[in-house]
C-alpha cells in the first residue's frame, strides 16, 4: 500500500517553517523542490515571513577571513572556524561629500539630490548598522566643541531617502557616560554599548522593536562593574544575547599596529570573560568586525547577468 501524496500547497506550507540552512540540504531531493527553493520568489518571501530566524555570528578579521563563531554557554569550549580564505575589500577613504545609493539592479551609484545632511562627523571606527530598511550611525555634532561634545544617533531611511535622528537613552546626556558602539539584537532591535569613566558601570541598552511604534524607547539589560579588562574603545564591535545577558565582543589586542592579534571575548554578567584568539594578523589599520548573519532563500539579482547571489 502506497501512502497518498500530500497536496502541493500543504507541502509548501510545511516547508515554510523549515530553517533556510535545512532547506538547502533538501534541494537535491527532487527537481521540484530545487526549483522551489532556488527560483520561486513567492515562496522565498513566504519563507522569510514564517520561518524561525537563525542567527550565526560571523567575524571579518583584519586579514579578510570570514569566521563563524559557535558559542555554547553550557560547558563546551567555544570555537572558531575559517570558512573563506580571502576576501578583497576596498580600503581607500572617500572624501566626497555627496550622498549616494548603490543600486544592484543597475550596478551603479546614484547621487541623492536635495537632501539635508546632518551636521555630524561619523567616526570611521564607530561602524554603521543596517536594520529594517534603515542605516544607523553614531555621530558627533561638528558645531559643538569640547567639553560640550555629545554623541547623536543618526538614521537614513532608504524608503524616504531622508536622514533623521533617534533619541539616545538618558545616560548619554550625563557626564561620565559616552555611547561607544552600536549593534543589533536579532533583526528587530538596536543595542547600544555605553562606556562609563573609571567610577561608572559599562551598560548595555536595547530599544523596543524597530518599526512597531513611532517613538523608540530604551531599556537597560546589562550593567558591568567593575569593567572587564577587554578595552571597549578603539576597534571594538559586539553582539548582545539579550536573554542570556552575554556580550560577544571582537577587537584587536593592540591598535594600529603592523602585526596584531584579533580576539573574541565572551563576557558574562559577572564581568568574567572567555578569550578566543584568531592568531597574528599582518594587515594594520583595520579592525575586526562581528555581525549576525541570517541565512535566507532571498537572492540578489546582479545587473547585466543572469546569475543570482544567494544570501
UniProtKB/Swiss-Prot annotation:
Coiled coil: none annotated. It comes from Arabidopsis thaliana (Mouse-ear cress). Residues 1-46 form the F-box domain. This is F-box protein At3g18320.
